């Protein structure tokens, strides 16, 4: 983090310096000049930049001094430890500058923190390492014997790659009686020899001469080169060819093709015959001119031999000689000026590039580069740009550009940028250079983990195995690297009584949730808790989600018959009058199931009966009713076995055994009472017995029911304090009745004993239930506030 901060600080200093670069350049001093002799070995000392810049060595190292030169060739190297500026390689002045004098290599010195910019130049001093060389080692000069003394004959000059005093200084010729040599200077500064006739020739005495021409340079010691001059003495030819004009000036575009006609020169000779025939040739042509141009010896047409390059040479001075068949010749000069065309694309030199860059740091310097164009004029003017839809901008100072961020970036929206730097010149047609770079964005922890859901509902079937993987929660972080590594944890529950750490656990790495122990629906129907997700950033960011766990009931409880009691005591006998109509309610089997949902949906069916077809059981409520009219032939005692079955998978069941006694003279509740019969002592005694028996049975039944209800309520109260109750949604099937563990008797019945006074006939009257069914309570927040479930059993006996 500390290194990153220093980098950002340094980049901002560079940016600030570039903003002031224009002002600093306006007041900049003259370029600093240094010199070095050519052919000096590489790594040779040039200067100490720290002393030149007035900097201490520590300050020099801190400011990150760099040496930048135009183009991609760097002839100098900087020792950062000693601040010595050294030669990068051995320099050859002739290769670098040719005949240009002085030979100056320009470079720039860049300083950071704050940014400063100095122009400097290195002058390469020539040494005399080249001797004069004649391109033609043998020259033929034809001299008419009629030539008077003082006649001059130009000779082909020698070439010396050195410059200044190391170039050709003068020419000398071997001793003879007729000629001497003069050293002449052309307009471009080059020197050439001219042969001067001192004494008239006589062909009859001497037909030819062989002389040695020597070219000397001004070096110390001087170097020399020689050529042989053959002088042929001719008979009289008294007229030399003359050009139409002594000087030609032409312009030619540098992109002219090979074979292009540059110009046509023309000369005439007043002589006739062979002496009037003229041939043209290049005179005193340098090696470069000889490679570039050719002349038709018959027509005088000058054509291109190779492509021109304005950036290398802007003009050529070509001497043309017109020679007749005799000894005379004429000369003219053709100045060929090369016109620049836009044939060089701009060049981009990258000095510094930074990637990745932090996403939250505006005005960060990304790249520092320079641009150049070898063309001239409008062809060398340059414009630089990048794509408009990018959050970056360019700032320029002379030919240097800085690429920096325009505003804070968002790595989560875009993790990298492909930037194309387009450099265009103003020539026609315009030439374009493009530099592509990819800038990566470094992540900053600015995004908290986000769960895929704000809440999760998990369904776990009771009696699960411990350490069961029940589900996974997942959170993602838009950051990257350690900033996107998510750790999961359980947050403290809002309910302090909830033993969360003993119920579930979470894998911190992948968010897998595990049930630590087996759950019991009858003890805990559901619970909720919060999970947290935090990243590894600095500072760390986090988020949370709600997890609801719903315990699904399993069919692990069989139906329990509340009535009639099945405790092995004396069986309860139901009395049914023989006069009962079909559908007469004999009794009702009441049962409950500790499970819930469809596991608590109960159905009833008659499993066994003493006489089939006499009684029936309603499947949805357990009511036992007569199926037909009773007759005297029907047995008085009947034993019924009722099967109570839940709707679980697999289903569980229980049975209830009923004893039914058919009696005479016992009426239904709404049947008209029979007329009073004569009092009989025996009938009265029987009535008393029946009343006592019925009262005893009813009292015992009521006491058993109350005791059972009290025990169930006590157990339910303890269970309700641990968890919540869940009630299944949807209607019950038509053949089932919901008897979940939170229910007891759904109805209460009244039993009324009616005695027919004086008749001696005893009848029981069964009344309809007077307590309505209560809908099941759906525990939620109300049950959490009250730990006692509304399970009550009520009976009224008259």
Curated annotation (Swiss-Prot):
Family matches, as SUPFAM superfamilies: Cadherin-like
InterPro entries with a match to the protein in the record: Cadherin-like_dom, Cadherin-like_sf, Cadherin_C, Cadherin_CS, Cadherin_N, Protocadherin/Cadherin-CA
What is the membrane topology noted in the UniProt record heading this document?
Single-pass type I membrane protein
Q: Tell me the first and last residues of the signal peptide.
A: 1-28
Keywords (alphabetical) are: Calcium, Cell adhesion, Cell membrane, Glycoprotein, Membrane, Repeat, Signal, Transmembrane, Transmembrane helix
Which PANTHER family does the protein's record reference?
CADHERIN-87A, PROTOCADHERIN BETA-13
This chain's function reads: Potential calcium-dependent cell-adhesion protein. May be involved in the establishment and maintenance of specific neuronal connections in the brain.
List the protein's name: Protocadherin beta-13
